[in-house]
Amino acid sequence: MFDESYTIKNFDDVLFKAISDEKRRQEEHIELIASENYVSPRVLEAQGSVLTNKYAEGYPGKRYYGGCEFVDVAEELAISRAKLLFGAHYVNVQPHSGSQANAAVMMALLSPGDTFMGMALPHGGHLTHGSKVNFSGKLYHSVEYGVDSNTGLIDYDALEKLALQHKPKLIIAGFSAYSRILDWARFREIADKVGAYLMADIAHVAGLVAVGLYPSPVPYADVVTTTTHKTLRGPRGGLILCKENEEIEKKLNSSVFPGMQGGPLMHVIAAKAVAFAEALLPEFKTYQQQVLANARTMCSVLQSRGYDIVSGGTDNHLLLVDLINKGITGKEADAALGRANITVNKNSVPNDPRSPFVTSGLRLGTPAATTRGFKEREITLLSNWVADVLDNVHDETNISRVKTQVLLLCREFPVYA
Protein backbone atom coordinates (compact mmCIF):
# COMPACT_ATOMS: atom_id res chain seq x y z
CA MET A 1 0.00 0.00 0.00
CA PHE A 2 1.22 3.48 -0.85
CA ASP A 3 0.69 6.57 1.24
CA GLU A 4 -0.09 9.56 -0.99
CA SER A 5 2.30 11.59 1.13
CA TYR A 6 5.22 9.62 -0.33
CA THR A 7 7.40 12.08 -2.23
CA ILE A 8 10.85 12.09 -3.75
CA LYS A 9 12.01 14.67 -1.22
CA ASN A 10 13.81 13.06 1.73
CA PHE A 11 13.76 9.72 -0.14
CA ASP A 12 16.06 10.34 -3.10
CA ASP A 13 17.94 13.52 -2.32
CA VAL A 14 20.15 13.43 -5.41
CA LEU A 15 17.23 13.10 -7.81
CA PHE A 16 15.13 15.63 -5.87
CA LYS A 17 17.96 18.14 -6.15
CA ALA A 18 18.31 17.49 -9.90
CA ILE A 19 14.58 18.10 -10.44
CA SER A 20 14.64 21.20 -8.25
CA ASP A 21 17.70 22.52 -10.05
CA GLU A 22 16.05 21.92 -13.42
CA LYS A 23 12.92 23.75 -12.31
CA ARG A 24 15.06 26.69 -11.21
CA ARG A 25 16.98 26.58 -14.50
CA GLN A 26 13.74 26.77 -16.46
CA GLU A 27 12.59 29.74 -14.40
CA GLU A 28 15.93 31.59 -14.54
CA HIS A 29 16.91 30.94 -18.15
CA ILE A 30 15.16 32.16 -21.28
CA GLU A 31 14.42 29.23 -23.56
CA LEU A 32 15.06 29.86 -27.25
CA ILE A 33 15.43 26.26 -28.45
CA ALA A 34 12.82 26.05 -31.20
CA SER A 35 11.75 22.50 -30.33
CA GLU A 36 11.08 23.22 -26.64
CA ASN A 37 8.10 24.65 -24.82
CA TYR A 38 6.44 24.63 -21.41
CA VAL A 39 3.37 22.49 -20.76
CA SER A 40 0.50 23.65 -18.59
CA PRO A 41 -0.07 22.37 -15.03
CA ARG A 42 -3.06 20.46 -16.46
CA VAL A 43 -0.80 18.54 -18.83
CA LEU A 44 1.63 17.84 -15.98
CA GLU A 45 -1.27 16.60 -13.86
CA ALA A 46 -2.44 14.14 -16.51
CA GLN A 47 1.06 12.88 -17.23
CA GLY A 48 1.71 12.29 -13.54
CA SER A 49 -1.60 10.49 -12.99
CA VAL A 50 -2.36 6.86 -12.07
CA LEU A 51 -2.91 6.12 -15.76
CA THR A 52 0.81 5.34 -15.81
CA ASN A 53 -0.07 2.08 -14.03
CA LYS A 54 -2.26 0.69 -16.83
CA TYR A 55 -1.16 -1.59 -19.64
CA ALA A 56 -3.42 -1.29 -22.68
CA GLU A 57 -2.02 -3.12 -25.70
CA GLY A 58 -4.28 -2.68 -28.70
CA TYR A 59 -6.75 0.09 -29.47
CA PRO A 60 -9.90 1.41 -27.73
CA GLY A 61 -12.51 -1.34 -27.61
CA LYS A 62 -9.98 -3.91 -28.89
CA ARG A 63 -7.50 -4.39 -26.08
CA TYR A 64 -5.50 -7.45 -25.12
CA TYR A 65 -5.92 -6.67 -21.42
CA GLY A 66 -8.93 -6.21 -19.19
CA GLY A 67 -9.67 -3.13 -17.14
CA CYS A 68 -9.15 -0.67 -20.00
CA GLU A 69 -12.56 0.98 -19.95
CA PHE A 70 -11.28 4.23 -18.44
CA VAL A 71 -8.03 4.53 -20.37
CA ASP A 72 -10.16 3.94 -23.46
CA VAL A 73 -11.97 7.16 -22.60
CA ALA A 74 -8.66 9.03 -22.46
CA GLU A 75 -7.47 7.66 -25.81
CA GLU A 76 -10.81 8.27 -27.52
CA LEU A 77 -10.78 11.87 -26.26
CA ALA A 78 -7.27 12.38 -27.63
CA ILE A 79 -8.25 10.90 -31.00
CA SER A 80 -11.47 12.88 -31.40
CA ARG A 81 -9.82 16.15 -30.38
CA ALA A 82 -6.88 15.64 -32.73
CA LYS A 83 -9.28 14.91 -35.60
CA LEU A 84 -11.08 18.16 -34.85
CA LEU A 85 -7.84 20.14 -34.53
CA PHE A 86 -6.35 19.00 -37.81
CA GLY A 87 -9.39 18.09 -39.90
CA ALA A 88 -8.13 14.52 -40.24
CA HIS A 89 -10.18 11.38 -40.83
CA TYR A 90 -7.68 9.08 -39.12
CA VAL A 91 -5.59 9.68 -36.01
CA ASN A 92 -3.20 7.46 -34.07
CA VAL A 93 -2.12 8.94 -30.73
CA GLN A 94 0.01 6.00 -29.58
CA PRO A 95 3.50 6.77 -30.98
CA HIS A 96 5.86 7.49 -28.12
CA SER A 97 7.71 10.15 -30.12
CA GLY A 98 7.86 11.88 -33.45
CA SER A 99 10.73 9.64 -34.50
CA GLN A 100 8.67 6.54 -33.73
CA ALA A 101 5.73 8.01 -35.63
CA ASN A 102 8.01 8.48 -38.65
CA ALA A 103 9.42 4.98 -38.25
CA ALA A 104 5.91 3.52 -38.11
CA VAL A 105 4.91 5.29 -41.32
CA MET A 106 8.01 4.03 -43.10
CA MET A 107 7.38 0.50 -41.88
CA ALA A 108 3.79 0.76 -43.12
CA LEU A 109 4.60 2.11 -46.59
CA LEU A 110 8.12 0.85 -47.38
CA SER A 111 10.09 -2.38 -47.44
CA PRO A 112 13.75 -2.53 -46.37
CA GLY A 113 15.92 -1.25 -49.19
CA ASP A 114 13.18 0.86 -50.80
CA THR A 115 14.12 4.34 -51.97
CA PHE A 116 12.66 7.45 -50.35
CA MET A 117 13.49 11.15 -50.37
CA GLY A 118 13.87 13.54 -47.46
CA MET A 119 15.44 16.88 -46.68
CA ALA A 120 19.17 16.70 -45.90
CA LEU A 121 19.93 17.22 -42.22
CA PRO A 122 22.51 20.01 -42.83
CA HIS A 123 19.92 21.82 -44.97
CA GLY A 124 17.23 21.76 -42.27
CA GLY A 125 15.88 18.22 -42.35
CA HIS A 126 15.64 15.72 -39.49
CA LEU A 127 17.58 12.60 -38.56
CA THR A 128 14.58 10.44 -39.48
CA HIS A 129 14.37 11.94 -42.96
CA GLY A 130 17.24 9.81 -44.24
CA SER A 131 20.37 10.59 -42.25
CA LYS A 132 22.92 7.81 -42.70
CA VAL A 133 23.43 7.55 -38.93
CA ASN A 134 19.69 6.97 -38.37
CA PHE A 135 17.50 3.90 -38.95
CA SER A 136 15.91 5.76 -41.87
CA GLY A 137 19.21 5.91 -43.72
CA LYS A 138 20.25 2.40 -42.75
CA LEU A 139 17.11 0.35 -43.41
CA TYR A 140 16.13 2.23 -46.56
CA HIS A 141 17.90 3.87 -49.48
CA SER A 142 17.61 7.59 -48.78
CA VAL A 143 18.04 10.32 -51.37
CA GLU A 144 18.46 13.80 -49.92
CA TYR A 145 17.18 17.08 -51.32
CA GLY A 146 18.15 20.50 -50.02
CA VAL A 147 17.94 24.25 -50.32
CA ASP A 148 19.34 26.60 -52.93
CA SER A 149 22.74 27.84 -51.75
CA ASN A 150 21.92 31.42 -52.76
CA THR A 151 18.37 31.80 -51.45
CA GLY A 152 18.24 29.28 -48.60
CA LEU A 153 14.90 28.11 -50.01
CA ILE A 154 13.93 24.62 -51.15
CA ASP A 155 14.68 24.23 -54.84
CA TYR A 156 11.53 22.43 -56.00
CA ASP A 157 12.79 22.07 -59.57
CA ALA A 158 15.94 20.32 -58.34
CA LEU A 159 13.78 18.21 -56.02
CA GLU A 160 11.62 17.16 -58.96
CA LYS A 161 14.67 16.21 -61.03
CA LEU A 162 15.94 14.04 -58.18
CA ALA A 163 12.54 12.39 -57.87
CA LEU A 164 12.36 11.65 -61.60
CA GLN A 165 15.88 10.24 -61.48
CA HIS A 166 15.51 8.02 -58.40
CA LYS A 167 11.78 7.15 -58.51
CA PRO A 168 11.29 7.08 -54.72
CA LYS A 169 8.43 5.14 -53.18
CA LEU A 170 8.00 7.87 -50.53
CA ILE A 171 8.78 11.59 -50.34
CA ILE A 172 9.01 13.26 -46.94
CA ALA A 173 8.15 16.95 -46.74
CA GLY A 174 9.19 18.41 -43.41
CA PHE A 175 12.03 19.96 -41.45
CA SER A 176 13.69 20.69 -38.15
CA ALA A 177 15.41 23.94 -39.15
CA TYR A 178 13.66 25.62 -42.08
CA SER A 179 11.96 28.95 -41.52
CA ARG A 180 9.71 29.13 -44.55
CA ILE A 181 6.33 27.74 -45.63
CA LEU A 182 6.40 24.45 -47.50
CA ASP A 183 4.50 24.19 -50.77
CA TRP A 184 2.41 21.10 -50.06
CA ALA A 185 0.72 21.23 -53.47
CA ARG A 186 4.09 21.22 -55.25
CA PHE A 187 5.25 18.28 -53.16
CA ARG A 188 2.03 16.45 -54.08
CA GLU A 189 2.56 17.21 -57.75
CA ILE A 190 6.11 15.84 -57.64
CA ALA A 191 5.04 12.73 -55.72
CA ASP A 192 2.30 12.03 -58.25
CA LYS A 193 4.74 12.32 -61.15
CA VAL A 194 6.76 9.40 -59.80
CA GLY A 195 3.95 7.46 -58.11
CA ALA A 196 5.29 8.09 -54.61
CA TYR A 197 3.54 8.36 -51.29
CA LEU A 198 3.80 11.81 -49.69
CA MET A 199 4.44 12.08 -45.96
CA ALA A 200 4.37 15.49 -44.27
CA ASP A 201 6.28 15.87 -41.01
CA ILE A 202 4.84 18.94 -39.26
CA ALA A 203 6.51 18.34 -35.89
CA HIS A 204 7.74 21.92 -35.67
CA VAL A 205 4.67 23.75 -36.96
CA ALA A 206 1.77 21.59 -35.74
CA GLY A 207 0.48 24.28 -33.38
CA LEU A 208 0.50 26.82 -36.20
CA VAL A 209 -1.24 24.36 -38.54
CA ALA A 210 -3.89 23.59 -35.92
CA VAL A 211 -5.03 27.23 -35.80
CA GLY A 212 -4.72 27.95 -39.51
CA LEU A 213 -1.59 30.10 -39.38
CA TYR A 214 0.47 27.66 -41.44
CA PRO A 215 -0.99 25.74 -44.40
CA SER A 216 -2.27 22.27 -43.55
CA PRO A 217 -0.79 19.32 -45.44
CA VAL A 218 -3.70 17.02 -44.55
CA PRO A 219 -5.52 17.54 -47.89
CA TYR A 220 -2.32 16.86 -49.85
CA ALA A 221 -0.30 14.23 -47.99
CA ASP A 222 -1.02 10.53 -47.78
CA VAL A 223 0.16 10.61 -44.16
CA VAL A 224 1.02 13.41 -41.72
CA THR A 225 3.20 12.97 -38.64
CA THR A 226 3.99 15.31 -35.80
CA THR A 227 5.25 15.55 -32.29
CA THR A 228 2.84 16.75 -29.63
CA HIS A 229 5.21 19.17 -27.91
CA LYS A 230 7.01 22.08 -29.63
CA THR A 231 4.40 24.57 -30.93
CA LEU A 232 1.55 22.23 -29.98
CA ARG A 233 2.59 22.69 -26.33
CA GLY A 234 1.69 19.20 -25.16
CA PRO A 235 3.66 16.32 -23.64
CA ARG A 236 6.61 14.82 -25.47
CA GLY A 237 5.09 12.30 -27.85
CA GLY A 238 4.08 11.48 -31.41
CA LEU A 239 0.95 11.60 -33.55
CA ILE A 240 -0.04 10.23 -36.97
CA LEU A 241 -2.85 11.70 -39.08
CA CYS A 242 -4.28 11.11 -42.52
CA LYS A 243 -7.23 11.79 -44.75
CA GLU A 244 -9.64 8.94 -45.46
CA ASN A 245 -7.87 5.91 -46.91
CA GLU A 246 -8.89 2.59 -45.39
CA GLU A 247 -5.91 0.68 -46.76
CA ILE A 248 -3.33 3.12 -45.39
CA GLU A 249 -5.18 3.43 -42.07
CA LYS A 250 -5.01 -0.34 -41.52
CA LYS A 251 -1.32 -0.39 -42.39
CA LEU A 252 -0.61 2.46 -39.97
CA ASN A 253 -2.50 0.87 -37.09
CA SER A 254 -0.70 -2.44 -37.44
CA SER A 255 2.63 -0.69 -37.95
CA VAL A 256 2.34 1.23 -34.66
CA PHE A 257 1.00 -1.81 -32.80
CA PRO A 258 2.22 -4.51 -32.86
CA GLY A 259 4.82 -3.48 -35.44
CA MET A 260 6.76 -0.75 -33.61
CA GLN A 261 5.43 -0.70 -30.06
CA GLY A 262 3.78 -2.78 -27.39
CA GLY A 263 1.71 -1.07 -24.73
CA PRO A 264 0.94 2.63 -25.24
CA LEU A 265 1.77 5.18 -22.55
CA MET A 266 -1.73 5.94 -21.31
CA HIS A 267 -0.67 8.76 -18.98
CA VAL A 268 1.03 10.50 -21.92
CA ILE A 269 -2.01 9.92 -24.14
CA ALA A 270 -4.18 11.51 -21.43
CA ALA A 271 -1.78 14.47 -21.38
CA LYS A 272 -2.10 14.68 -25.17
CA ALA A 273 -5.89 14.81 -24.78
CA VAL A 274 -5.54 17.72 -22.35
CA ALA A 275 -3.15 19.58 -24.67
CA PHE A 276 -5.48 19.10 -27.63
CA ALA A 277 -8.36 20.49 -25.58
CA GLU A 278 -6.23 23.53 -24.74
CA ALA A 279 -5.32 23.92 -28.42
CA LEU A 280 -9.02 24.08 -29.31
CA LEU A 281 -9.49 27.19 -27.13
CA PRO A 282 -9.57 30.64 -28.81
CA GLU A 283 -6.61 31.83 -26.75
CA PHE A 284 -4.40 29.18 -28.35
CA LYS A 285 -4.69 30.96 -31.70
CA THR A 286 -3.82 34.24 -29.98
CA TYR A 287 -0.75 32.53 -28.55
CA GLN A 288 0.32 31.23 -31.97
CA GLN A 289 -0.15 34.66 -33.53
CA GLN A 290 2.21 36.04 -30.89
CA VAL A 291 4.72 33.25 -31.58
CA LEU A 292 4.86 34.40 -35.21
CA ALA A 293 5.04 38.09 -34.31
CA ASN A 294 7.86 37.39 -31.88
CA ALA A 295 9.82 35.37 -34.44
CA ARG A 296 9.52 38.16 -36.99
CA THR A 297 10.62 40.72 -34.40
CA MET A 298 13.64 38.63 -33.39
CA CYS A 299 14.58 38.17 -37.02
CA SER A 300 14.33 41.90 -37.73
CA VAL A 301 16.40 42.91 -34.70
CA LEU A 302 19.18 40.42 -35.41
CA GLN A 303 19.33 41.47 -39.06
CA SER A 304 19.56 45.12 -37.99
CA ARG A 305 22.52 44.12 -35.82
CA GLY A 306 24.31 42.60 -38.81
CA TYR A 307 23.44 38.93 -38.43
CA ASP A 308 22.60 36.80 -41.45
CA ILE A 309 19.35 34.81 -41.34
CA VAL A 310 19.21 31.78 -43.64
CA SER A 311 16.57 32.40 -46.35
CA GLY A 312 16.45 36.05 -45.30
CA GLY A 313 13.58 35.79 -42.84
CA THR A 314 10.94 33.58 -41.24
CA ASP A 315 7.35 32.54 -41.85
CA ASN A 316 7.07 30.35 -38.77
CA HIS A 317 8.33 30.10 -35.19
CA LEU A 318 12.04 29.68 -35.88
CA LEU A 319 15.01 31.32 -37.53
CA LEU A 320 18.42 29.98 -38.45
CA VAL A 321 21.30 32.39 -37.80
CA ASP A 322 24.36 31.99 -40.04
CA LEU A 323 27.46 33.02 -38.07
CA ILE A 324 30.07 32.44 -40.77
CA ASN A 325 30.44 36.16 -41.48
CA LYS A 326 30.99 36.80 -37.76
CA GLY A 327 33.92 34.41 -37.46
CA ILE A 328 32.45 32.46 -34.55
CA THR A 329 31.15 28.91 -34.36
CA GLY A 330 27.75 27.74 -33.29
CA LYS A 331 29.39 25.91 -30.41
CA GLU A 332 31.03 29.10 -29.13
CA ALA A 333 27.80 31.08 -29.53
CA ASP A 334 25.74 28.41 -27.75
CA ALA A 335 28.13 28.34 -24.80
CA ALA A 336 28.41 32.13 -24.48
CA LEU A 337 24.63 32.61 -24.54
CA GLY A 338 24.28 29.82 -22.00
CA ARG A 339 26.54 31.74 -19.63
CA ALA A 340 24.11 34.65 -20.02
CA ASN A 341 21.19 32.34 -19.10
CA ILE A 342 19.88 32.27 -22.67
CA THR A 343 19.42 28.69 -23.87
CA VAL A 344 19.85 28.00 -27.59
CA ASN A 345 21.19 25.20 -29.77
CA LYS A 346 24.05 25.26 -32.22
CA ASN A 347 22.89 24.19 -35.66
CA SER A 348 24.39 23.44 -39.04
CA VAL A 349 23.65 25.89 -41.82
CA PRO A 350 23.37 24.91 -45.51
CA ASN A 351 26.78 23.87 -46.88
CA ASP A 352 28.29 24.26 -43.41
CA PRO A 353 32.09 23.78 -43.51
CA ARG A 354 32.14 22.74 -39.84
CA SER A 355 31.13 19.46 -38.20
CA PRO A 356 27.69 18.98 -36.55
CA PHE A 357 29.46 19.11 -33.18
CA VAL A 358 30.77 22.61 -33.90
CA THR A 359 28.54 24.12 -36.64
CA SER A 360 28.37 27.63 -38.04
CA GLY A 361 24.88 28.55 -36.93
CA LEU A 362 22.26 28.89 -34.24
CA ARG A 363 18.63 27.81 -34.41
CA LEU A 364 16.38 30.15 -32.43
CA GLY A 365 12.67 29.79 -31.73
CA THR A 366 9.98 31.74 -29.89
CA PRO A 367 7.36 29.20 -28.63
CA ALA A 368 8.69 28.89 -25.06
CA ALA A 369 9.43 32.59 -24.61
CA THR A 370 5.93 33.38 -25.88
CA THR A 371 4.42 30.94 -23.39
CA ARG A 372 6.15 32.96 -20.65
CA GLY A 373 4.26 36.01 -21.86
CA PHE A 374 6.95 37.72 -23.92
CA LYS A 375 5.66 40.08 -26.60
CA GLU A 376 7.44 42.36 -29.05
CA ARG A 377 8.86 44.59 -26.30
CA GLU A 378 10.50 41.72 -24.44
CA ILE A 379 11.64 40.00 -27.64
CA THR A 380 13.29 43.22 -28.83
CA LEU A 381 15.21 43.47 -25.56
CA LEU A 382 16.12 39.80 -25.68
CA SER A 383 17.23 39.86 -29.31
CA ASN A 384 19.53 42.78 -28.62
CA TRP A 385 20.99 40.91 -25.65
CA VAL A 386 21.62 37.92 -27.91
CA ALA A 387 23.44 40.20 -30.35
CA ASP A 388 25.36 41.86 -27.51
CA VAL A 389 26.71 38.47 -26.43
CA LEU A 390 27.45 37.28 -29.95
CA ASP A 391 29.31 40.49 -30.79
CA ASN A 392 32.04 39.31 -28.41
CA VAL A 393 31.62 35.80 -27.05
CA HIS A 394 34.73 36.20 -24.88
CA ASP A 395 33.65 39.39 -23.06
CA GLU A 396 32.67 37.91 -19.70
CA THR A 397 31.86 41.32 -18.19
CA ASN A 398 29.29 41.93 -20.90
CA ILE A 399 27.92 38.40 -20.60
CA SER A 400 27.49 38.93 -16.85
CA ARG A 401 25.65 42.20 -17.54
CA VAL A 402 23.27 40.45 -19.93
CA LYS A 403 22.72 37.64 -17.43
CA THR A 404 21.64 40.18 -14.81
CA GLN A 405 19.08 41.63 -17.23
CA VAL A 406 17.86 38.15 -18.16
CA LEU A 407 17.28 37.25 -14.51
CA LEU A 408 15.25 40.42 -13.95
CA LEU A 409 13.08 39.68 -16.99
CA CYS A 410 12.58 36.07 -15.91
CA ARG A 411 11.34 37.21 -12.51
CA GLU A 412 8.88 39.52 -14.24
CA PHE A 413 7.59 36.64 -16.39
CA PRO A 414 7.67 33.38 -14.39
CA VAL A 415 6.87 30.14 -16.20
CA TYR A 416 4.78 28.73 -13.36
CA ALA A 417 3.46 31.59 -11.26
From Swiss-Prot:
<dbReference type="InterPro" id="IPR015421">
    <property type="entry name" value="PyrdxlP-dep_Trfase_major"/>
</dbReference>
<dbReference type="GO" id="GO:0030170">
    <property type="term" value="F:pyridoxal phosphate binding"/>
</dbReference>
<keyword id="KW-0028">Amino-acid biosynthesis</keyword>
<dbReference type="InterPro" id="IPR049943">
    <property type="entry name" value="Ser_HO-MeTrfase-like"/>
</dbReference>
<dbReference type="InterPro" id="IPR039429">
    <property type="entry name" value="SHMT-like_dom"/>
</dbReference>
<dbReference type="Pfam" id="PF00464">
    <property type="entry name" value="SHMT"/>
</dbReference>
<comment type="pathway">
    <text>One-carbon metabolism; tetrahydrofolate interconversion.</text>
</comment>
<comment type="function">
    <text>Catalyzes the reversible interconversion of serine and glycine with tetrahydrofolate (THF) serving as the one-carbon carrier. This reaction serves as the major source of one-carbon groups required for the biosynthesis of purines, thymidylate, methionine, and other important biomolecules. Also exhibits THF-independent aldolase activity toward beta-hydroxyamino acids, producing glycine and aldehydes, via a retro-aldol mechanism.</text>
</comment>
<feature type="modified residue" description="N6-(pyridoxal phosphate)lysine">
    <location>
        <position position="230"/>
    </location>
</feature>
<comment type="subunit">
    <text>Homodimer.</text>
</comment>
<keyword id="KW-0808">Transferase</keyword>
<dbReference type="GO" id="GO:0035999">
    <property type="term" value="P:tetrahydrofolate interconversion"/>
</dbReference>
<dbReference type="GO" id="GO:0004372">
    <property type="term" value="F:glycine hydroxymethyltransferase activity"/>
</dbReference>
<keyword id="KW-0963">Cytoplasm</keyword>
<dbReference type="InterPro" id="IPR001085">
    <property type="entry name" value="Ser_HO-MeTrfase"/>
</dbReference>
<comment type="similarity">
    <text>Belongs to the SHMT family.</text>
</comment>
<keyword id="KW-0554">One-carbon metabolism</keyword>
<feature type="site" description="Plays an important role in substrate specificity">
    <location>
        <position position="229"/>
    </location>
</feature>
<comment type="pathway">
    <text>Amino-acid biosynthesis; glycine biosynthesis; glycine from L-serine: step 1/1.</text>
</comment>
<dbReference type="InterPro" id="IPR015422">
    <property type="entry name" value="PyrdxlP-dep_Trfase_small"/>
</dbReference>
<keyword id="KW-0663">Pyridoxal phosphate</keyword>
<feature type="binding site">
    <location>
        <position position="121"/>
    </location>
    <ligand>
        <name>(6S)-5,6,7,8-tetrahydrofolate</name>
    </ligand>
</feature>
<dbReference type="InterPro" id="IPR019798">
    <property type="entry name" value="Ser_HO-MeTrfase_PLP_BS"/>
</dbReference>
<protein>
    <recommendedName>
        <fullName>Serine hydroxymethyltransferase</fullName>
        <ecNumber>2.1.2.1</ecNumber>
    </recommendedName>
</protein>
<dbReference type="InterPro" id="IPR015424">
    <property type="entry name" value="PyrdxlP-dep_Trfase"/>
</dbReference>
<dbReference type="GO" id="GO:0019264">
    <property type="term" value="P:glycine biosynthetic process from serine"/>
</dbReference>
<dbReference type="GO" id="GO:0005829">
    <property type="term" value="C:cytosol"/>
</dbReference>
<feature type="binding site">
    <location>
        <begin position="355"/>
        <end position="357"/>
    </location>
    <ligand>
        <name>(6S)-5,6,7,8-tetrahydrofolate</name>
    </ligand>
</feature>
<feature type="binding site">
    <location>
        <begin position="125"/>
        <end position="127"/>
    </location>
    <ligand>
        <name>(6S)-5,6,7,8-tetrahydrofolate</name>
    </ligand>
</feature>
